[in-house]
Amino acid sequence: MFSSRSFIFWVLILGIVFWGVTAWAHSDGVFAQPETPAQEGAHHGHDAMPGAERMTLGATVYKHMCTFCHGADGNGGGKAMAYLYPWPRDFRKGIFKHRTTPPGSLPLDKDIYQTIKRGLPGTAMPAWENALSEEETWAVVQYIKGFSERFKNEIPKAAIEPGPVPPAAPESIAAGKKLFKEMRCAGCHGTDLKGEGPLAGQLYDIWNHRVFVYDLANPNAYKFGYEPSDIYMTLTTGIDGTPMKNYNHLTDKERWDITAFLHSRLEMERVQESGYEIDLYSTKVDDEFVLDPYHELWDKIPEKVVRLIPLNARKSPVTHIKIRAALNEDAVAFRLEWEDPVPDRSSSRHQDFKDAVAMEFALGGVLLHTHGHNEPFFGMGNRGKVVNIWQWRADWQTEIETKEKLEYATQGIDLDTMIFGGEVNPVDALNPFRDAPVEEMNAEGFGTLTPQPHTKQNVLGKGVWKDGHWSVVFYRTLDSLNKWDKQFTKDQPILVAFAIWDGSQQDRNGRKVISMWQRLHLP
């Protein structure tokens, strides 16, 4: 007969053996992680793929889609990091801002899944819903978990269930407004919710990065969704790693009251329905192209709206761009339009920044999201995967138009003789592209942007600012023989992306808003 001490000893031994067998039964390599609890019915096909195969797929997806920002080892220090604010998440700490679990808990798999699928509005994290399959998304969830020891040692707590959304009655909104003041929310978010409270410029997260306080009146700025249930969840869970604490010390009703107040202040007219990745279609026309963006030709061309991603957090980013594409027997033309209340046409002073827009094309016959996602990275391409870029600049066009007006006003007068003693204007001599407001370039990754030689520049363009909008036309003939130019063939969709620089936001170089790849179909 065992003594009580012997019995306890053998129970512990059997427990350790059983745990070890269970752990080995689920181990698929160094990155294999256990599933999180309470997820029955949360998704389909999560466990259909064997563990080792799933981890291999996750590693492939991460390499092609995530490593540029989050880094090969998940530390948030990818090659794009220097151009981004907020910085990409450091997965090694196992701290995730969006969760349905209580404060301090690890997220559930489905929380990470939702972040990947929906993206984080207002940041450089796009929505990968149309880019990744279900299997790919769940695979990369498991791969990401492998960067942190927390997933090996902790089990996430069960998800918080918010319950039904109560009616946003006037008394609930009034109570929420009072609580907003009592909880001193205005210290960060401001009394008008615009994110300009007295503490807004003094906040840092646990990574010692400055925190950007978003405009809570802008529904596009809610990272985790602007529906009442989304706002309630953020108030309940907080945003781990940031000064945004949870408000669990308030009653459930009080949190719903604050939710009702915040939701009542949303400027819903700012919501723009547009896709991260869509299909664009070029229209075949018989007309000759002109560079005027307001020519009647463009009235006959259908318009598509593409969503833009700010690489640097800002209060009023350009959120979308409108695209029209046309093709005739000799050339291709595009009309781009976006909102911009103030035209920034000059960069002559060091404190001035100009407006600009660019189109980016993947070279060669590459398809989107096939063969292991081997398309170029939409952010300037990557090594061995060159992109062709057309950039229009407002300051260049202003200089050209000013020069034309000056030439007309001074016909018969040799200004070079008067000003430079017969020598050519030295500034003009240093700007070989100044006869057109468009420059054609190539890149194969960050830091490789290279203008094409002057003799190879064959893209024309013109921009017009009118009624708070920029409209820009790009034009190029189809017969380019330059191997670094995009060839517009009809056999498969062309990958095209867009970027906008807003001078009022001090945009320049890598500071801009961009799109993901779009599929352009030619007639």
What are these regions (language model features)?
Residues G29-V61, F151-K181:
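Electrostatic cytochrome c docking/interface patches
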Residues A52-G71, A168-K194, A200-I206, I258:
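Sequence/structural segment immediately N-terminal to covalent heme-attachment motifs in c-type
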Residues A82-E129, E134-K145, Q202-L250, R255-H263, ...:
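Extracytoplasmic electron-transfer domains, predominantly the class I c-type cytochrome c fold
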Residues V305-L430, K486, K490-G510:
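Surface-exposed, glycine/proline- and aromatic-rich loop segments on solvent-exposed faces
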Residues I321-R324, V459-W465:
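Beta-strand-rich interaction surfaces with strong enrichment in secreted/lumenal proteins
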Residues K466-P523:
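Long, compositionally biased interface segments
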